[in-house]
Amino acid sequence: MSSSVSSKTRYWVLALAAIVLDQWSKWAVLSSFQYRERVNVIPSFFDLTLVYNPGAAFSFLADQGGWQKYFFLVLAVAVSAYLVRAILRDEFATLGKTGAAMIIGGALGNVIDRLIHGHVVDFLLFYWQNWFYPAFNIADSFICVGAVLAVLDNIVHRKTQEEKY
């Protein structure tokens, strides 16, 4: 078991790095911006801003009555626990474990926000003319990239399994 745990250290380091990067970036924005303040980074395309999101990634369910805070808190912890178990049991190949670690780090980064602030801190705002993508944060990015890696791992693994038969 100890060799199994030590071989997985890189995934725990990745998850921790995601949490640290996410929390540091949010601290920097909270320390430097007023609520809804915007600073243009790339004209007509990308701003830094400070907004609060009581919903999920990309403001999903943000306009609900408050129940979603607890729902997404429990969901993030449950998904993270499942993914930790899956990594420990080698249920994924390397790409899937990397994706799972990224999802864990992103999910727990947003859990920390919900516990400390009662909402998630978002600050990355992409737009084009009158079209705005919902503001998001580093944790959301880790979750999305991790999900893509997990899906790719599943596709590759499934194809490999089919080739065996």
Curated annotation (Swiss-Prot):
- Where is this protein found? Cell inner membrane
An example of a Gene Ontology cellular component annotation for this protein is: plasma membrane
Q: What are the UniProt keywords, alphabetically? A: Aspartyl protease, Cell inner membrane, Cell membrane, Hydrolase, Membrane, Protease, Transmembrane, Transmembrane helix
Q: Name one GO biological process term.
A: proteolysis
Question: What start-end ranges are recorded for coiled-coil regions in this protein?
Answer: none
GO molecular-function terms, A-Z: aspartic-type endopeptidase activity; endopeptidase activity
Its EC number is: 3.4.23.36
> Could you tell me the membrane topology recorded for this protein?
Multi-pass membrane protein
Source domain of life is Bacteria
Pfam families from the UniProt entry = Peptidase_A8
Kindly tell me the pathway this chain contributes to: Protein modification; lipoprotein biosynthesis (signal peptide cleavage)
Functional summary from the UniProt entry = This protein specifically catalyzes the removal of signal peptides from prolipoproteins.
What name does the UniProt record give this protein?
Lipoprotein signal peptidase
The record lists the lineage as: Bacteria, Pseudomonadati, Pseudomonadota, Betaproteobacteria, Neisseriales
Q: Which gene encodes it?
A: lspA
